[in-house]
Amino acid sequence: MVKKPISSSDEVFKFEIPSSPKSSAGASHSSTDSPSSVFLSSEAENGVEDRKRFSKSPTAQSPTSSVEAESPDQKRSLGLWSKSSFDGSNLLSDKNDCKTESKADSKTERKKSSSSSQYKANMHFHKLFLDVPTEEPLRQSFTCALQKEILYQGKLFVSENWICFHSKVFGKDTKISIPAFSVTLIKKTKTALLVPNALIIATVTDRYIFVSLLSRDSTYKLLKSICGHLENTSVGNSPNPSSAENSFRADRPSSLRLDFNDEFSDLDGVVQQRRQDLEGYSSSGSQTPESENSRDFHVTESQTVLNVTKGETKPPRTDAHGSRAPDGKAKILPAHGQSETIGILHKMESRKCPTLRHILIFYAIIVCALIISTFYMRYRINTLEERLGSLTSIMDPHSTEQTAPSSLGSQVQLNVEVLCQELTANIVTLEKIQNNLQKLLENGD
């Protein structure tokens, strides 16, 4: 009768405190040595084994009672720990929720502010430039300055089909509207030969330089993305032809000549003219950014002229190579073009060397002329000194002869003056005597 409630109490303790190590140990011990397990096994075993297990059961009851005595304290500690952990998890979850809400609010505010600023910029853009249709939105605006006789600080507006600039300096509005399809050149350049913050935008008739760009690379990429025809032209001028073009050229007959000296003579003239212009630029002292930019622009123009002329003379070359290689391989063409460019460069260098030689010869002639002139001037100076010496020796006796009468004349002049002074003094004394005699005569009468 006593053994059954013990087993029930063991089962209750085992379910109430599953996490404590002591209880788990006691539970395992009690589960193996409990009287209920003894009764279940005794039904299948003999009486000797039952007696042995009954002798073990009183010893197994002592740890279970101690564990039951310790269970209320453990329950309290576990309850407090679970409450504190639950409160901490609630606080952490609240903080995380607050952070996520603040981030979401800041993102929404930023989106609203950016959308409002973009809307205002779009309205301002369409208000300034009436040529741009209202259906075309503004893509981006950049702060920059237009370089002319002075810098016009303003903004560069870029839309899908227009590149516009607006500036207001000294109450004067400056507006520039450039259609994207009319742009022929977009190039990076430097301000004052040092600062890389400028762009050149050129059309067929005009050329504009925009400086003080804070983000030049992003501006350049955006303008290139808008002016897609420039990329198409650059791809069209590439030296690698397509496979279909190569096959077509390979099938054509090779009855054309291979001598192009007459055709490249015009190119030599153009190159020579450009070289003279570049030498003129280099001979000038200080260069302004405008002169550098204009030089770059002229160089690009000459390059386009060379590309056009090469494009005109390209089919005969490709036909000739097509006749030699009927398989249609175009790997020889770039090498041929490179050899031509190398030949042109060698010609230019060979032309530059004689010019340097002529300059050195000219300087040597000038130095020789200066040396000869110095010797001649020295000879003339010596002859003049000799003549002056002879003239001074001739003039010395005449000067001695003239000094003697002049000294006598000066002495005579001194004697005359002394005599005049004495005579005047005597006359004065005589007048005094005469006056005294007249007074005496008057008194005597």
UniProtKB/Swiss-Prot annotation:
Taxonomic path: Eukaryota, Metazoa, Chordata, Craniata, Vertebrata
Disordered: annotated span: 1-119, 277-331
Phosphoserine found at: S238, S255, S265
Gene3D superfamilies documented for this protein: Pleckstrin-homology domain (PH domain)/Phosphotyrosine-binding domain (PTB)
Residue ranges of domain GRAM in the record: 123-190
InterPro entries xref list: GRAM (IPR004182), GRAM_domain_protein_2B (IPR052633), PH-like_dom_sf (IPR011993)
Protein name as annotated: GRAM domain-containing protein 2B
Modified residues (N-acetylmethionine): M1
Any Pfam family the entry gives: GRAM
Gene label: Gramd2b
Annotated GO CC locations: cytoplasmic microtubule
Domain of life: Eukaryota
Segments of skewed composition (Polar residues): 1-10, 56-68, 82-93, 281-291
Residue ranges, compositional bias (Basic and acidic residues): 94-112, 311-330
A GO molecular function held by the record: identical protein binding
Annotated keywords: Acetylation, Phosphoprotein
The species this protein was found in: Rattus norvegicus (Rat)
